[in-house]
Amino acid sequence: MTGSLLASKRIRKEFGSKSRVVDIPDLIGMQRTSFERFLQRNVPPEEREDIGIHLVFKSVLPIKDFTGTSSLEYVSYSFGETKHSMKECISRGMTYEIPVNITVRLVVYDVDKDAGVTSIRDIKEQEIYFGTIPLMTKRGTFIINGTERAVVSQLHRSSGVFFDHDKGKSHSSGKIIYTARIIPVRGSWIDMEIDPKDIVNIRIDRRRKFPVTILFKAFGYTNEDILSFFYKKEQIVKKDGILFKEFNPDNLKRNRASFDILDPETGEAVVKKGRLFTLRALKQLQVAGLKSIPISEEDIIGRGFATSVVHPETEEILAKAGSLIDPEVLEKIADAGITEFSILYVDTYSSDSMRKTLAVDKVTSRAEALIEIYRRLRPGNPATPEVAQDFIDHLFFKPAYYDLSNVGRLKMNHRLGMSTGIDVRTLRREDILLTAATLVELKDTQGAVDDIDHLGNRRVRAVGELLENQYRIGLVRMERAIKERMSMQEVDAMMPHDLVNPKPVSAVVREFFGTSQLSQFMDQTNPLSETTHKRRLSALGPGGLTRERAGFEVRDVHPSHYGRICPIETPEGPNIGLIVSLCTYARVNDFGFIETPYRIAKDGVVSKQITHLSAFEEKEHPIAQANAVLDDQGHLMNDLVTSRVGGEFEMVAKNDIEFMDVSPNQLVSVSASLIPFLENDDANRALMGSNMQRQAVPLIRSEAPLVGTGIEGVVARDSGVAIVAEHDGIVVDVDAKRIVVKNTENGKGSDDRTVTIYTASKFVRSNQNTCFNHRPIVKKGDAVRKGEVIADGPSTEMGELALGKNVTVAFMPWGGYNYEDSILVSERLVKEGVYTSVHVEEFEVVARDTKLGKEEITRDIPNAGEEALKDLDDSGIIRLGAEVKPGDILVGKITPKGETQLSPEEKLLRAIFGEKAGDVKDTSLRVPPGVEGVVTAAKVFSRRGLPKDDRTRLIEDLEIEKLEKDRDDEVRIITETIQERLEDILAGQALQAVVKKGKKVVVPAGTLVTRGLFEGISLTDLMGLTVEDSSLTEMAHVILEKAETQIKKARENFNNQASRYEKGDDLPPGVLKLIKINVAMKRVLSVGDKMAGRHGNKGVVSRILPVADLPYFEDGRTVDMVLNPLGVPSRMNVGQILEIHLGCAARGLGRQIDDLIYEKKTDELRARIKRIFTTPLIKTGERANKDKTHYDFSSHYTVEKSMAKRTNEEEIQFVDTIDHMDDTEFLEFASMYKNGVHMATPVFDGAAESEIKSLISYAGLDPSGQSTLYDGRTGEPFDKPITVGIMYMLKLHHLVDDKIHARSIGPYSLVTQQPLGGKAQFGGQRLGEMEVWAMEAYGAAHALQEFITVKSDDMTGRTRMYEKIVKGQNVLEPGMPESFRVLTKELQSLGLDINLLEGKK
């Protein structure tokens, strides 16, 4: 068995020197997790967290009526079961959705207005149907109206507080204007700015600005409160005519003394008059216990009062808080006999912005402030303090109207240094005060502002959150309707379901999935395109950016993207940088920030413990790269290590390193990490390479790359296109359409599921019309493990991603046919169907009930000969397997015609041939131009209640037959497994009671249980089984009960599915029958097809050469493709050359293995395979010098020596397995490598040049990787050796057959009468201005006249031309082009009298 397990899995020769510390996470886990968190479907109601749909219900409900006498309260929600399976939804054009039921409580109150008491009168609780929600499939997609759609996650600015400045561009003075913005998820935006006059202004919702202190006063703060929050105070005391201030060393630094400052103990002058206070002097005075120091009046003139100064007798305000001190005020204070007052302390580095703002602000009271703000935001509405107070409370402090979100609160706490609870999701007054304080401090210190492109300030809204927002919009719409119903009708007589109408909610959700910019038609070209589409992040969409307004900075790569967003994969064109991809190891945390994993390092030792950090958690921590040199215990070997600190690269001492990357391919996306030798390619070409892999068409026979990167298997498994075993088990039955596996996970079948039947999809059409087909890769009797691929999907082979083919490529010019990226291809590739792909087109026809009568699907079509009907069955539907070409009938349909006046001849024909022929027209579904293929499927959907035709019944019978087979197999396997299990458990026990089959005794009492005893006895008959050991009897009964439940479930499933077929279908109104026909087309590689490698090396097939003419090797093998060597140097994608060399070695080793298999030299083959796969790579730490210290394959070598040097457990296990295989198993394993040994050269940790050379030599080839080729035309060798090897080439979805198009006659535009444009409209080729010039330049006057008149928009000329051709008079008579008439009419409509003057010369 060990052998067959190894044989079912492809082993690659690994070149990576870094062992994988952490597995690549589930590639579409982000989508699934987000949706699961939104629904919390499998969480009991009482345990649900406040997220997703639960939070939406909690935040919108309870809904109270306008009088407060009743309220509708939320209790819980639950889900029903899906009505149709995913397969049915796709074929019937339905949405895969799940019904939602919500339990609500209607509470009616008695209100005693006089006593002000409210008591509950009545409570009614009810579960209500609340519409449906589309359900995510296992593959992370949604099926909406029969098509698979993916919801792209949005990357948007997170909520919270942000500080920025205008870089001095706004004001003419060039002064930098600092701004702060508080962004909530829901509610009003607050903008603060400091203008050039140092006044702090605020805007709410981008309205007119006003001083921020008005808002503070509206919050209830006085001038003194505001000043004490922003500034320190200094107490001034007047003694004996001299002013003194308290001695505070912090406030005196860098100040000068107004008088001699004396030591209180010795009396000597410590600081002389006019001198600076030094740190030493301040310390001396502090030690001496000095309490106050003398100051002059000049020291405080120009400073501000901290509190208002009031006359002690008259209570007249002599100076307001914040007003400036001048000699007059000081005189007034002295006259009033006031000896103490406090002033503001503003140091030389700070501004008094807030004092200036207070001076500008003319508002004196809270009521005045409230009314002032209300007038600014609601001009025209009458303002009272109460209304204004309520308005401001709603604006910032009510959860229903303002939501900062937990992310916003987290960011605000982080930025303002607060520790407010994360559940406080509204603003607090302190938040606005602190924001203003931080803004002033930033401006004063010229501090660093926030970088809005940093990933700490951008977060991901995944599908769950997007849906949550839509659901809330729907519920708020519904809330208004509920309030109106509560007030209009008598609540006592109502039940909750009378109030709740779920339609607005369902409509919003449906609109989101159908029309939102973020809900996209899924790219299903191949598994990689599916996976990357689900991992895509878009900055566009509602609440995001627009293409036109997005600047360069937003699109650019940022240091915080490292390990989170791929710097390579992004579309070319207007969306560049706005649509990006998640990195391989990245994940999105609960707050929506992207995290990447790191290994924890401490004191120079890197552990295997992993932590995930978001961009702002990473901040200033030194992080070593994945290629940092470690010893076996994880100690960093170099004293100085290259690391990243705050986005910059620095050399850091090893003991200071805190984290280390987990893998070299951590910083690129899935698509980019599939490119071998990515590190040797220019970034622009790498971008093209990763984008073009997504366009590769699945071929008839897929082939995994010989030179891969090692993650092909992960992509194939996670993409969901391959069938993966759900449990450990043994394959019981396999055919092309299904795999039956007996589960062995939990003992022998005692698990809840004893058998799993996997159904394979055959020639199913994908969204991009490529062919989705499963091919089982296991055999009957194979053991399979959970998570193992058991059937390949499109573009997968042996459970690995296989987008293209390994072909022999030569780099050389060939007769100019590979000029400018053209590709020369061998005829062998066409003959053997190497690049042949199957494309499936779906056509549908609808029979409707029209005003004139019912349309009919029939074989009886007027004016159609027997030849046209030969492939239609009696129901008028084409048979499966029929070959069709353009114009052929797929489904015969006739439509009633309106009554017309008949000529006498027609009346006679009617009289002879009956009524039928005349009153119907042929509206059959015919094959459109450009489609030629084989009919692979026909689906018929009939309206419920109408009789079914023969074809429909035949299709249903076949489907029910399949279901019966599945049910019978499942019951049989469960029965056999349970019988065996019972025989094992009860072995040697004597039966205490007889076992009967009906009334007949099958096993008498006292019989000892042996293997095979229960064979042929049903589980129901075994239910009364008893043995001496009561515990064993009990165990046997538990097993039998479980089995009975499984069998019952299998039968129920069959009955449910079978009954669905018998019921008929739900079709749109007026539709009687819907028929869908699938036609599969073979697309053979042809001239004009676009092909590409994985390094951005794209080109178009220019010529398909006969094999005899192609360059060939000495042994007669020809090359498959010839590429232009000039395509490499200027593009700087050298990775393709390294790939070709390594591919050359891989194919050479494969040929050696093939020869040894042919010669049956098993021992030599064993040694060679062990040598290939276990030759030690450079030990970790020698990577930097890899080129100098490589191991030579051809040197004296034994596996034992290798094992001593390498401690890789997998490798030891591999050698052990190979040694224990018998010859048959081993040859089966070895034959996997006949066509080449598969290599894995991971991104940024790949094979070194020296390793490739050594491998080429070991394969018996020239280490230069070049060979002498001979010209197929002459037989002469070419002048110089040529680089030739194996390259992985893809056929892209830009196929010439889909683009080529010809027109003779066709539709014309209504106004201009010119032919339409484009293939879809069956249009013509535009002859534009430049083409006219070209014709003129060649003097082709008559041809040109024909082009722009009779072949275009000369209507009379067109008909004349037709008549002339019919009569054989080929004379051109052009008339007036219609577009000229349109032009003259246009000018006449503008009031210009313009006419064409005709005259003869």
Swiss-Prot record:
Q: Which domain of life is it from?
A: Bacteria
Output the SUPFAM superfamilies linked to this UniProt entry: beta and beta-prime subunits of DNA dependent RNA-polymerase
Its subunit composition reads: The RNAP catalytic core consists of 2 alpha, 1 beta, 1 beta' and 1 omega subunit. When a sigma factor is associated with the core the holoenzyme is formed, which can initiate transcription.
User: What GO cellular-component annotations does this UniProt entry give?
Assistant: DNA-directed RNA polymerase complex
According to its UniProt record, which reaction does this protein catalyse? RNA(n) + a ribonucleoside 5'-triphosphate = RNA(n+1) + diphosphate
The entry's keywords = DNA-directed RNA polymerase, Nucleotidyltransferase, Transcription, Transferase
The record's annotation in InterPro entries points to: DNA-dir_RNA_pol_bsu_ext_1_sf, DNA-dir_RNA_pol_bsu_external_1, DNA-dir_RNA_pol_su2, DNA-dir_RNAP_su2_dom, DNA-dir_RNAP_su2_hyb_sf, RNA_pol_bsu_bac, RNA_pol_bsu_CS, RNA_pol_bsu_protrusion
GO terms, molecular function: DNA binding; DNA-directed RNA polymerase activity; ribonucleoside binding
GO terms, biological process: DNA-templated transcription
Q: What is this protein called?
A: DNA-directed RNA polymerase subunit beta
Function (record text): DNA-dependent RNA polymerase catalyzes the transcription of DNA into RNA using the four ribonucleoside triphosphates as substrates.
Q: Which family does it belong to?
A: Belongs to the RNA polymerase beta chain family.
Which residues lie in coiled coils? none
UniProt cross-references to CDD domains, sorted A to Z: RNA_pol_B_RPB2
Q: Which organism is it from?
A: Desulforapulum autotrophicum (strain ATCC 43914 / DSM 3382 / VKM B-1955 / HRM2)
The EC number of this protein is: 2.7.7.6
